[in-house]
Regions:
Chain B
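C-terminal motif of bacterial Sec signal peptides marking the signal peptidase cleavage site
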Residues: 16-20
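Conserved N-terminal structural module of periplasmic/extracytoplasmic solute-binding proteins
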Residues: 21-139, 155, 340, 361, ...
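Hinge/lid segment of periplasmic solute-binding proteins
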Residues: 45-53, 57-58, 106, 130-185, ...
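Extracytoplasmic/periplasmic substrate-recognition and gating elements
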Residues: 62, 93, 99, 283, ...
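Helix-loop-helix "hinge/cap" segment bordering the ligand-binding cleft or interdomain interface
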Residues: 93, 150-154, 168-239, 253-291, ...
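Extracytoplasmic "Venus flytrap"/periplasmic binding protein-like
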Residues: 93-159, 173, 195-197, 201, ...
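Ligand-binding pocket segment of bilobal, Venus flytrap-like solute-binding proteins
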Residues: 218-220, 266-325, 353, 368-374, ...
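Long, aromatic- and glycine/proline-rich binding clefts that accommodate carbohydrate-like moieties
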Residues: 331-334, 382-435, 439, 464-465
């Protein structure tokens, strides 16, 4: 295919690069800001790169239970991811491949609930969680997020790919439902598994709202909530806040970069052919 | 894993159903007993693993939780909670049968956290705060009465009816045990004023009282010399008492009537004050503070970006001392300017309350702990000094001998105005305050309309809370 | 005979299916459905710290009369109406620019535009707060040093700018997913159609509108749905940046709900808002999903 490079292309490309710069900037600023001294962080004109990097902010950050926060985030995201993956792949498979009573209704309810922002059930959810005695624990975030039906929806999409003939052949061979699921279904939906896992992990990590409402104790905060708290306590000290923000952002960005193909796939599968 | 979890959950749910889905009283008690029964051990264990921080308490010990706003000053560079931990260590040494767990909270998200925790039944036992919120919790029946702590000796020692009344709810019982108090005031930067040749505008004699005319003169000089005035901060409710006192003082208005039964800010003086402030902001003498809250306004002041601030107290002075020195700024505290030169100041009262968590032993232990913090021979005065303000107990005397600045702050107590922070619906009123200022500053409505609207809504909030 | 056998099979399938669905339904019913029902029920009560009193539909009546609620509804709609077209065009532009590049470049740009989403609202807001700061912020400094403005502008506190300032952050934190979707679906446009059209002498614009755009329609509709829902939920930006100010200019329904629940302690009222918000979102997504559904089965 022949392509001539016109002025328009160059302008568009330049525009694209400027936009990229704006999108990278916050992350870049957090990373570099974490190593700047307090005075430098609010300096104008800004110091575009830390000329005299310092670890001072991290020392101050460590006087807070920042590592505990980080661990809480990892724990919450990890467990949520596990439960969501198992539960959703089972449900997604039958929704895609079985014909049963109530199927259509059930699926519509799931789809409707998916569109519902969880914030609207905030107060009752909090009441419920406290009835169970798990308010202000990691489970107060994990369990409600496991109820969110996006995973079911996504896994249904992936399960549509399972050839029906294969399932029927298995049935004729006398394979039980559980075996069919583990030996035929699972291998086929594996990419979906990866996509859902990473998707859940990232979304849970950044689910500020749930964390804000469900967690109180300083030792139980997640890293994002911890940073928001720091922002309020240390409003004067940008350096420490940046160090905290870096601690919240770097791990999750790293995870994203490592698994971005799965992630992209998850997003695409969850959407097209809806 | 999943199975255990589901079991635990199911059990927890059962417990819930059995306890009945009735009033909120039930919610606080369900959690604890459920964890004791064998069936729900899984849920209990899960919760503990998640937290992972519960240290084992000695057998038979009462465990209480203390939530503290950053009211005690910390030693330089120490994180929130360091001093509090020292108090706890000293208390636990004397009372080995009580274990105190500390949580530090901040002023921005703290109040909402407390609300959430009250709803969820996970609120602390002891809270260190001020009457505004504490009395509203009392009015909602969430607190333990502290009448037995207000002994005749204590009441006589405090000898200040207004202050004692601020610790009472409308049922006549005491719910807050006060430790220290001080007036809110404002502060100017000596460096800026000197550079703008405006030192003559302020009064450094006596109680440093001054008039609105002098204040306006100072604004003009600062502006001419290129300094920014303070922000009329109103992005949120943090620190709003400072700017509210500023508004009421400049033309001698009052937030409420003397009986604290009705809002009266829409009197002539209040409207005039808001009109004047709008004028000042439009002329660039003061900054439109719709993007700043009280804390951020103080940040700008101590960073040297603004020449004065309308939110200052001895506590803030000590918390920000280090930054001020770094930026080579000397802050001079002043009362608010007023038309007649006699300020009417709002004041803070620091004190403790005890939440009713349905456990008498905890309530007793909490009271003991509060008593220790306020009345221990060694720690009482020390704690007062850490709040950087003045003891409510007259018998403690002058805790800041020879400190001229503190002497000035102490002199302001005679200008205390009626304390309205315990008015019903106070919390709701605060949510109307800053939008009102924003409406005025951004020209959405005239000062008169805005303040009338505010007073209507605020008065409605009193009715709502009945 | 045949019918009953069929029913038997179907019955069996149903049993098995529900066994597989059980865990998902368990979580869903307890943590989504039950709170939803509780929310609807309590929205009929005057429900605060003191207790509950049944007041029928009063909360709803008051809500529609509540000026602040009306303002938040308008703000929310402005955010939706503002973010949806910009997001679509922006995403389309980036995707069109990058989908034919080599895989490395493509995934580079994909990552770049997804970065703010992954970084998380809290961390990103820390930086934006500084960008918008009237006195120390970089935006005012930049504009002043380029002589575009003379006086500092109070981005998040000025009634003319506040909502737009929020909108910009909202877009940067939500455009990542649409870009990924567009890149994927542009890659799916059959090459032969495009080439055939080019042979027929169609220019780039014609190729785009007549060949590519129709096959992008389902994706576009889906993007419209998710961006709409996303904008309806805008909360943390407001909570972290403006507290709804100035004078309720950035209060969204979601933020107002939060304020009512946690600052005014009016849980019943907050729940009523939640119900209405859910209905609005439900209705909008229903319409959009319908449209999507009919278009997709090609």
């Amino acid at each position: 295919m022949k392509k001539k490079t016109g002025i328009l292309d160059i302008i568009s490309m330049a525009f694209l690069l400027i936009l990229s710069f704006i999108f990278i900037f916050p992350f870049y600023w957090i990373l570099t800001g974490a190593f700047k001294s307090q005075k430098v962080t609010v300096k104008l004109p800004p110091e575009w790169f830390p000329l005299s990097p310092t670890m001072e902010n991290f020392h101050k950050l460590m006087q807070n239970p920042a590592l505990q926060w980080l661990w809480n985030s990892v724990f919450i995201c990890g467990i949520t991811m596990l439960i969501v993956c198992v539960v959703s792949s089972m449900a997604g498979y039958v929704l895609a491949k079985k014909r049963f009573y109530g199927q259509a209704t059930l699926f519509s309810i799931f789809v409707f609930a998916m569109a519902l922002p969880k914030q609207v059930i905030l107060v009752p959810l909090m009441k419920l969680v406290s009835f169970m005695g798990i308010h202000d624990t990691s489970w107060a975030i994990i369990l409600p997020l496991c109820g969110w039906p996006f995973g079911v929806f996504l896994m249904k999409q992936f399960s549509e790919n399972i050839p029906t003939e294969l399932l029927e052949a298995a049935k004729i061979d006398g394979s039980g439902e559980v075996r069919t699921f583990s030996s035929i279904v699972m291998p086929i939906v594996k990419p979906g598994f990866g996509a859902l896992a990473i998707f859940t992990f990232i979304n849970t990590w950044n689910d500020y709202f749930m964390q804000l409402v469900m967690l109180n104790s300083r030792a139980k905060l997640t890293i994002s909530l911890g940073v928001a708290t720091l922002q309020q306590e240390f409003s004067t000290n940008y350096g420490v806040i940046m160090a905290g923000a870096a601690m919240a952002a770097v791990p999750i960005v790293a995870v994203f970069l490592m698994f971005q193909n799965y992630f992209t796939q998850g997003i695409t599968m969850g959407a097209v052919k809806g | 894993m999943k199975k255990i979890l589901s079991l635990g959950l199911a059990a927890a749910l059962m417990a819930t159903t059995l306890a009945g889905c009735g009033g909120s009283g039930g919610s606080e008690t369900t959690a604890a007993p459920a964890a004791d029964t064998g069936t729900t051990a899984a849920a209990g264990e899960a919760a503990t693993t998640a937290g992972g921080s519960d240290a084992a308490a000695p057998a038979g010990a009462v465990e209480i939780t203390w939530w503290a706003f950053p009211t005690y000053a910390q030693d330089a560079d120490k994180p929130a909670g360091t001093y509090e931990a020292e108090i706890i260590a000293a208390f636990e040494a004397k009372n080995p049968d009580i274990k105190v767990n500390l949580e530090t909270i901040d002023f921005t998200s703290g109040p909402e956290k407390i609300t959430a925790a009250i709803e969820a039944g996970t609120v602390c036992d002891v809270l260190f705060d001020a009457p505004g919120r504490i009395i509203s919790y009392a009015q909602n029946g969430k607190l333990v009465k502290l009448d037995d702590m207000f002994t005749d000796e204590f009441v006589k020692d405090v000898n200040n009816e207004a202050l004692l009344n601020s610790c009472k709810s409308d049922d006549g019982s005491y719910y807050m045990y006060p430790i220290s108090t001080a007036a809110f005031c404002m502060a100017v930067s000596k460096q800026a004023l000197e550079a703008a040749d405006a030192m003559s505008c302020i009064n450094m004699e006596g109680d440093r009282t001054w008039t609105t005319a002098q204040f306006e003169e100072m604004l003009k000089k600062l502006n001419a010399a290129g300094f920014n005035g303070a922000t009329v901060y109103c992005s949120g409710q943090g620190g709003d008492q400072g700017i509210r006192a500023f508004v009421t003082n400049i033309y001698d208005s009052q937030v409420t009537n003397d009986e604290v039964t009705e809002y009266t800010l829409n009197d002539e003086g209040g409207i005039k004050a808001l009109t004047k402030i709008k004028e000042w902001v439009d002329a660039g003498y003061m900054l439109n503070g719709s993007a700043y809250n009280g804390g951020e306004d103080v940040d700008q002041f101590v960073a040297g970006n603004t020449a004065f601030t309308t939110l200052w107290s001895p506590g803030l002075a000590s918390q920000r001392a280090e930054t001020l020195t770094q930026n080579e700024i000397e802050a001079i505290a002043l009362p608010f300017p007023s038309d007649d030169g006699v300020p009417e100041l709002e004041y803070l009262v620091n004190g403790f309350c005890v939440f009713d968590n349905g456990d008498a032993a905890k309530a007793e232990a909490s009271k003991k702990f509060i008593d220790f913090m306020c009345n221990d021979e060694e720690w009482g005065p020390k704690d007062v000094v850490r709040t950087s303000v003045f003891p409510v107990r007259q018998s403690m005397g002058d805790l800041y001998p020879g400190d001229e600045e503190m002497g000035f702050y102490a002199s302001l107590t005679k200008y205390y105005s009626p304390y309205y922070n315990t008015i019903k619906g106070f919390a709701e009123m605060r949510t109307y305050w800053f939008p009102m200022l924003q409406a005025v500053l951004n020209g959405d409505s005239t000062p008169e309309d805005a303040v009338n609207d505010f007073v209507t809504k605020a008065n409605q909030s009193i009715a709502n809370a009945q | 005979m045949k019918q009953s056998k069929f029913n038997k099979i179907r019955m069996r399938e149903t049993l098995i299916s529900y066994a597989f669905l059980a865990p998902a339904l368990f979580f869903f019913c307890i943590f989504v459905l039950l709170p939803m029902i509780m929310g609807v029920v309590t929205s009929l009560f005057r429900y605060n710290m003191k207790g509950m009193t049944f007041i029928g539909l009063d909360n709803y009546v008051n809500m529609f009369k509540d000026e602040v609620w009306q303002k938040s509804l308008v703000n929310t709609l402005i955010l939706v109406v503002g973010s949806v077209p910009i997001t679509v065009l922006f995403a389309l532009f980036v995707a069109a620019m990058t989908y034919e590049k080599n895989p490395f470049t493509r995934s580079f740009f994909r990552c770049v535009f997804f970065l703010p989403v992954v970084t998380g609202t809290v961390a990103v807001t820390v930086v934006w707060k500084w960008i918008y700061d009237p006195l120390n912020g970089i935006l005012n400094w930049l504009l002043k040093s380029m002589n575009i403005i003379e006086k500092n502008i109070m981005w998040t506190g000025d009634k003319k700018f506040a909502l737009w300032a929020i909108l910009i952050i909202l877009i940067t934190t939500s455009v990542g997913q649409p870009i990924i979707l567009y890149i994927a679906s542009l890659g799916n446009v059959p090459k032969d159609y495009v080439e055939a059209a080019q042979v027929d002498g169609a220019n780039d614009l014609q190729v785009f509108w007549q060949i590519k755009w129709p096959s992008l329609l389902p994706t576009t509709l889906y993007i419209v749905v998710i961006t709409t829902i996303n904008s309806f939920q805008c909360f943390s930006l407001i909570q972290l940046l403006t507290s709804g100010g100035p004078n309720y200019r950035t209060t969204t329904i979601m933020y107002y709900l939060y304020e009512n629940a946690f600052k005014r302690f009016e849980y019943g009222y907050a729940n009523a808002m939640g119900v209405v918000l859910a209905l609005m979102i439900g209705l909008i997504s229903f319409i959009q999903f319908k449209a999507l559904g009919s278009d997709v089965e090609y």
